[in-house]
């Protein structure tokens, strides 16, 4: 829960900084891409964002969340697989560790084909603001951040 609040604080601060830089007077919507590997508690993140936006340029903003599926590639056999293929094999404490520190995936996840722990994360980690829509000088503007 604390993790989601910290992420919400970072998102709000970043959007406010971008809005100030781009002279946005009111933010209408923020699109947030969330990597599946983060395993975010979306309800907690939404509650935190809605609480933190009060009294700011984000007060009327709608937050739109897009989940990016995590995908890996084995460096040993070049197999490509998805997080959903191996998540069921993780213990609860292992999944929680990956939630807080996604880099720990290399400790707990192995290639389902050859068993190697040597893989790269192709996509689906981290959180990024993918778009901000707001009002500048009375007219709506769209900003792909």
Predicted regions located by residue number:
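N-terminal, polar/charged subdomain of small-to-medium soluble alpha/beta proteins
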Residues: 1-29, 36-145
């Amino acid at each position: 829960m604390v993790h989601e609040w910290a992420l919400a604080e970072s998102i709000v601060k970043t959007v406010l900084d971008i809005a100030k830089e781009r002279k946005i007077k009111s933010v209408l919507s923020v699109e947030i891409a969330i990597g599946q590997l983060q395993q975010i508690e979306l309800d907690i993140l939404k509650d935190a964002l809605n609480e933190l936006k009060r009294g700011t340029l984000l007060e009327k903003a709608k937050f739109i969340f897009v989940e990016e599926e995590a995908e890996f590639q084995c460096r040993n056999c070049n197999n490509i697989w998805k997080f959903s293929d191996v998540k069921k094999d993780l213990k609860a404490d292992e999944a929680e560790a990956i939630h807080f520190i996604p880099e720990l995936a290399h400790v707990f996840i192995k290639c389902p084909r050859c068993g190697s722990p040597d893989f790269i994360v192709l996509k689906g980690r981290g959180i990024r603001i993918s778009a901000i829509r707001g009002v500048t000088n009375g007219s709506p503007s769209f900003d792909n951040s």
